[in-house]
Regions:
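Disordered, low-complexity "stalk" and linker segments at domain junctions of extracellular
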Residues: 1-96
Length: 96
């Protein structure tokens, strides 16, 4: 099995995420199953009003990915993202 990586692209001050630590995980949605990429990325957002950019290795056959986010004081939530394998978390997206 291939090893897929989840990577931090950038942390910027152009969003609405509060300062603190964020944990992200990505699950690839394939036609017949979901593939948990089994890696977690911990990111520190140092400012008030942050945004966090993530990218990961594309999974062959996946057209959608579930990005899972958790923060110290929040329950885990997720959002669906279409390819390409990139997500810019500005804090205004609805994580369910």
């Amino acid at each position: 099995m291939n090893e897929f990586r989840l990577n931090l692209l950038q942390v910027l001050g152009d969003g609405s995420l509060p300062r603190g630590y964020y944990w992200y995980r990505v699950v690839a949605i394939l036609p017949d199953c979901e593939l948990d990429l089994a890696n977690t990325l911990r990111v520190y957002a140092p400012f008030r009003g942050n945004s966090i950019g993530l990218f990961w290795d594309e999974v062959p056959g996946a057209e959608t990915y579930r990005v899972i986010r958790r923060r110290d004081d929040e329950e885990e939530g997720s959002i669906l993202v279409s390819s390409p394998a990139f997500f810019h978390d500005t804090g205004i997206q609805e994580f369910g």
